[in-house]
UniProtKB/Swiss-Prot annotation:
The gene is eno1. SMART domains: Enolase_C, Enolase_N. One of its GO terms (cellular component) is extracellular region. Its EC number is 4.2.1.11. InterPro entries: Enolase (IPR000941), Enolase-like_C_sf (IPR036849), Enolase-like_N (IPR029017), Enolase_C (IPR020810), Enolase_CS (IPR020809), Enolase_N (IPR020811). Its main location: cytoplasm. This is Enolase 1. It comes from Streptomyces coelicolor (strain ATCC BAA-471 / A3(2) / M145).
Length: 426
């Protein structure tokens, strides 16, 4: 099999104008692979370490030259000669070279860039699309696009607490139809906001970011847009939230809608929302280390709605194993840069699926034109993907890749649709 011949890296810009790492891997048969690393705005405390330069004279301290040099001077020479298809061995070699628990020496952004670029090179050498190379012949499930069409929290300069208000086209017959429905609702929402004199500026992930009176108002506006676009809420298009509660948790309580609330009060609030709206999924409803609170909310709402651990699990198999053991959450958000390698990402997905947890493949708020997560969503048959609004090219690139994959699969393609959310009774 082809072996690694050269590894190069460079500093490029992400969708927020901040530097990130791009890596290219060349094999001795001429095959190449390239990958760019995303970056988050609301980051979990337990994520792998993203290496930044800290030099205020370059990119306000956010440069990634240290990570680039780590690839060129340390990782690359170590990996030359490795069989490119031995992904687990290659990733382990980088872990050993880094020799920390959180990838803080070489940087998760350096390690992940190489890890993904190797997979791209190996898939090219194997003459297979990435989703097929990683997922094998059973990779066939197209995910429900969880479109973040209204932004708040850390993703927008607005007074809305909840970070993401999403639509999920669960009633569509195909991914391409789901994408069309979502785009139509997105454009209709813009018209609804304009007619009410509300701002239509965009947040980091392409959703609108108006100042609203409450989080419920955001949900009501989206329901209005769904209906005005000609669709039935709950039957054709459902709603989903990313609360990102760790962002407004301080000193044991949640500063939410002008009040300090306990975990029990937040749980009651979510229970009211689940009764009032066609919600299929709530991500990070509580603080990332409030295991007791997560256990309580899962016991109360876990049979009615998907409860997704993002900051809670940070795509880390060890934290996920604790969540499974303690019945905390019932779904995993999958972000490759939280854990920092392809191998560990796939291990987390496998552990989740083996234990009855749903998985949602996810972008970050700081993205690039890299489309790897689209292939990963299909390779793992996870049935859900979160990659922003149907706007801004770094978001749309992933949706367009899924359209291509659907075309490649042809009659073998299955759209996850409503089956992705078995707990939803709406």
């Amino acid at each position: 099999m082809p072996s690694i011949d050269v590894v190069v890296a460079r500093e490029i810009l992400d969708s927020r104008g901040n530097p990130t790492v791009e890596v290219e891997v060349g094999l001795d048969d001429g095959s190449t692979g390239r990958a760019a690393v995303p970056s988050g705005a609301s980051t979990g405390a337990f994520e792998a370490i993203e290496l930044r330069d800290g030099d205020p004279s370059r990119y306000l301290g956010k440069g990634v030259e240290k990570a680039v040099l780590a690839v060129i001077e340390q990782i690359g020479p170590e990996l030359v000669g490795y069989d490119a298809t031995e992904q687990r061995l290659i990733d382990q070699a980088m872990f050993d070279l880094d020799a920390t628990d959180n990838k803080g020496s070489l940087g998760a952004n350096a390690i992940l860039g190489v890890s993904l670029a190797v997979a791209h090179a190996a898939s090219e050498a194997s003459d297979l699309p990435l989703f097929r190379y990683l997922g094998g012949p059973n990779a066939h499930l197209l995910p429900v696009p969880m479109m973040n069409i209204l932004n708040g929290g850390s993703h927008a300069d607005s007074n809305v607490d909840i970070q993401e208000f999403m639509i999920a086209p669960i009633g569509a017959e195909s991914f391409s139809e789901a994408l069309r429905w979502g785009a139509e609702v997105y454009h209709t929402l813009k018209k609804v906001l304009k007619n009410k004199g509300l701002a239509t500026g965009l947040g980091d992930e392409g959703g609108f970011a108006p100042n609203l009176g409450s989080n419920r108002e955001a949900l009501d506006l989206i329901l209005e847009a769904i209906k005005e676009a000609g669709y039935t809420p709950g039957e054709q298009i459902a709603l989903a939230l990313d609360v990102a509660a760790s962002e407004f948790y301080k000193d044991g309580s949640y500063a939410f809608e002008g009040k300090n609330r306990s975990a029990a009060e937040m749980t009651e609030y979510y229970a009211e929302l689940v009764e009032a709206y066609p919600l299929v999924s709530i991500e990070d409803p509580l603080f990332e280390d409030d295991w007791d609170g997560w256990n309580t909310i899962t016991a109360k709402l876990g049979d009615k709605v998907q409860l997704v651990g993002d900051d809670l699990f940070v795509t880390n198999p060890e934290r996920l194993a604790r969540g499974i053991e303690e019945n905390s959450a019932n779904a995993l958000l999958v972000k490759v840069n939280q854990i920092g390698s392809l191998t560990e990402t796939l291990d987390a997905v496998e552990l989740a699926q083996r234990n009855g947890f749903k998985c949602m493949m996810s972008h970050r708020s700081g993205e690039t034109e890299d489309v790897t997560i689209a292939d990963l969503a299909v390779a793992t048959n996870c049935g859900q993907i979160k990659t922003g609004a149907p706007a801004r090219s770094e978001r749309v690139a992933k949706y367009n890749q899924l359209l291509r994959i659907e075309e490649i699969l042809d009659d073998a393609a299955v759209y996850a649709g409503r089956s992705a959310f078995p707990r939803f009774k709406g």
